[in-house]
Every structure is written in C-alpha cells, then in structure tokens.
Amino acid sequence: VFSADSGQSNGLMINKKGKMLAACGANNGKQCLAQITKNGKVKPIVETFEGKKFNAPNDLVIHPRGWVYFTDPRYVGHEPLELDHMSVFRYDPITKTVHRATSDITKPNGVVVSPDGKTLYVAETDNGASGLEKEPLKEPKLRMTLNAFPIKKDGSLGKKKILADFGDKETGIDGMTVDQKGNIYAAFRAESRFGIVVFSPEGKELAYIPTPSLPTNCTFGIGDDASTLYITAGSGLYRIPCKIPGFHPALPVDK
C-alpha cells in the first residue's frame, strides 16, 4: 500500500480481516483513527470523543477480541486543542463506540497488548509541551514511564502499575512491540542511550539493542520472518534476528 497523503499516519496495524488501521496525527493530518484502503486512501473510522476532535492519535494496538486501543497525545500541530486531556482510547468495532481508557497518563505514546490479552502496556512520554508552542520550552517538565494496565472483561482498564520510571531528564519510549513470551521491545529515545530496550513483563531490563539513530518504532515480521525484529530509526529501516518469535495480537500464533 502506498499513500501520497497518509493524513499524518503514525502507528499502523493490520486487523484479522486484512485491513490496515492507522493512528493519524495533527499538523494538517486527519486527527483520527482510520483505515488505509488498498488504493492508499485514508478512511476515517472515528474522529471525535464526546463531540471534540482528537489531539493527534499516535499509536495503536488491536486486542485479540478486536478492540482498538490508541494513544492521543499532541507533540506537533497548529490545530487548536479541543480536548482538555491526553489519553488512551478504546474503539469497539462491534458497537462503533469509543471509550476513554485512561485518566492517569499525562501524555501516552506507544501502546501494545500482552500475548494473553490480559495486560495493556502504555509508554508515558511527556515532554511538557502541548505542541502549540512557538518556541521550545526552556525547562520542560518530563514524565517518562512504562506502565501496565490489567484489561478487564469489558475492555476497560484496571489500576495502573509503573513498570519502569526513566526520570525527568531525557526522552523515554516511542513505539513498542512484544514477543510470544510477553517480553516488551521498546524504542528508547534517550540521547545518552538510544536503541531498542527489551523488558520482561515485570519491567526488568533484559537486553539493549543500539541503533544508528533515534528509533521511533519496532515490530516483528510474520511467517518465516516471525523472529526478525524490524526497527524504524531516523530515515532508515533496520532488521535484526531474535531468538523468540514476535507476537501480533490480530494474527494467529504460529506453533
């Protein structure tokens, strides 16, 4: 699929029906959860919450039950902010409804679900800015954490658990993915140590994969490529073989 105008698509994922879903941001983007059709057109699925435009949908994950969780921060964009919060939302494709899933994450970024479908991992990457500033903040307040939320039977989230706190000095996590054992692969953007950091489901650091430039996202291939980790960093796309195959929530697991 090629799109000359992707509507500022960021996070992408293909559902069980083979449709590509996208989180479309601001800065002349669509500001919505959308489907990218086979001819590259952006087809909005949901554009508002309680009648107000989303800030700038950033990343998404499809739960095995079909729910779409997507993050809605604002890093760039000249459009006025209509919502007074930056949250994780859950879209239900059966009822065609959208629900606010979090109220205790100040600026959510990457999002991924555990292989058993019981936990939602959310990267909190708060640079203290709204995206409307004309000049960079001199002393931004940063909140950089990796969080785990239990997923209830109705798709709502339970109490947040902070798995890792990266302090308030450098940038934290962007996109994430998981392997079939539930380990989390996070695109870590700290200037002093950027690359892919692998965490256990409990938040223990297991491995570090340096990248040539600041990474933005990562995902595993499928089929024969299931153990290959693909990484976007700077203007490049990189790959590295891994010992454990990746997990895709919307696809069946190869056994």
PLM regions with names:
Residues V1-D5, N39-G51, S87-K107, P150-K169, ...:
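Blade-edge beta-strand/turn elements of extracellular beta-propeller
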Residues D5-C24, K30, E50-V68, H85-S87, ...:
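Beta-rich, blade/repeat-based domains predominating
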Residues C24, G77-E82, L132-P140:
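Short consensus segments that form the blades of beta-propeller domains
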Residues Q31-A34, M86-F89, T145-N147, G195-V197, ...:
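A short loop-to-beta-strand structural motif that recurs across blades of beta-propeller domains
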Residues Q35-V98:
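Hydrophobic alpha-helical segments and helix pairs
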Residues E139, A148-S156, P241-H248:
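Short loop/turn segments immediately following beta-strands, especially the blade-tip
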Residues N217-K255:
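Blade-level signature of beta-propeller repeat domains, shared across WD40, Kelch, NHL, RCC1
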